[in-house]
């Protein structure tokens, strides 16, 4: 996603899946699967169901994304 323009949206974590994957409900009502970005893994940032997050998605596949920020 570095060379293309990533689509950023806010969402809420619905459920935690295996391998640091999460189901995220976006503001527009769509539910996608997303994984944690590398920097968040490196700094041990915990994400729990109910947390508000910022998700980056590729314009080519809008069903998968990367969690880049957790709001406080």
Curated annotation (Swiss-Prot):
Residues 1-72 form the S1-like domain. One of its GO terms (cellular component) is cytosol. Keywords: Cytoplasm, Initiation factor, Protein biosynthesis, RNA-binding, rRNA-binding. InterPro entries: NA-bd_OB-fold, RNA-binding_domain_S1_IF1, S1_domain, TIF_IF1. The keyword RNA-binding applies. GO terms for molecular function: ribosome binding; rRNA binding; translation initiation factor activity. It is found in: Cytoplasm. SUPFAM superfamilies: Nucleic acid-binding proteins. The keyword rRNA-binding applies. Pfam families: eIF-1a. One of the essential components for the initiation of protein synthesis. Stabilizes the binding of IF-2 and IF-3 on the 30S subunit to which N-formylmethionyl-tRNA(fMet) subsequently binds. Helps modulate mRNA selection, yielding the 30S pre-initiation complex (PIC). Upon addition of the 50S ribosomal subunit IF-1, IF-2 and IF-3 are released leaving the mature 70S translation initiation complex. Component of the 30S ribosomal translation pre-initiation complex which assembles on the 30S ribosome in the order IF-2 and IF-3, IF-1 and N-formylmethionyl-tRNA(fMet); mRNA recruitment can occur at any time during PIC assembly. Belongs to the IF-1 family. This is Translation initiation factor IF-1. It comes from Porphyromonas gingivalis (strain ATCC BAA-308 / W83). The gene is infA.
């Amino acid at each position: 996603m570095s060379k293309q323009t990533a689509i950023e949206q806010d969402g809420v974590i619905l459920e935690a899946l295996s391998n640091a994957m999460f189901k995220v409900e976006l503001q527009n009502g769509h539910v996608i699967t997303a994984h944690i970005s590398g920097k968040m893994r490196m700094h041990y940032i915990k994400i729990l169901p109910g947390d508000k997050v910022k998700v980056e998605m590729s314009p080519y596949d809008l069903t998968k994304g990367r969690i880049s920020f957790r709001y406080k």
